[in-house]
Amino acid sequence: MSSTTKPAKPLSATWLTRWEPEDPAFWSNGGSSIAWRTLALTTVNLTLAFAAWFMVSALVVRLPQVGYTFSASQLFWLTAMPGLAGGTLRLVHMFLTPMVGTRHVVSLSTLSLLVPLVGWFFAVQDPSVPYWVLLLLSFFAGLGGGNFSSFMPSTSLFFPKRLLGTALAIQAGIGNLGVSIVQFV
């Protein structure tokens, strides 16, 4: 009876069946390109997520100029809601990547950012939009704040220890640039 070895199973389109970034052969034969591509995608997404998360703080100061007549307290609540939502959703995001995978988390979180972005686009054009709708849109803007808790741990899994600091610095540094972008635009 002869023993035959099966060839290594190729990486699945959804799940990585083998991931060994510390193995130099694995890293140089495709692991590196997957890791850097994943870093690029999650960094762009994180930049957009931070922009969406802090968008409300940039919009609230302009709401009276477009016809909204909210009290200072109401405006502060609109500004606070994304932070409250983002902080709470970070607890959920901690478990998402290991449960459903980085690809699904990135896809779903990017799509979820469309709700506050499109919603606020239309809301600022119509001062008759009720306060509770703006409060809900502010909550959904907080979805971007939760992304940080999914992407940083995911990046930690993709890179060998010798490159981990560089990868995390790129992701956090460029990702946080989203805050500045939304304040300047």
Residue ranges and their predicted role:
Residues 77-95:
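Central cavity-lining transmembrane alpha-helices of secondary-active solute carriers
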Residues 146-160:
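Intracellular juxtamembrane helix-capping segments at the cytosolic ends
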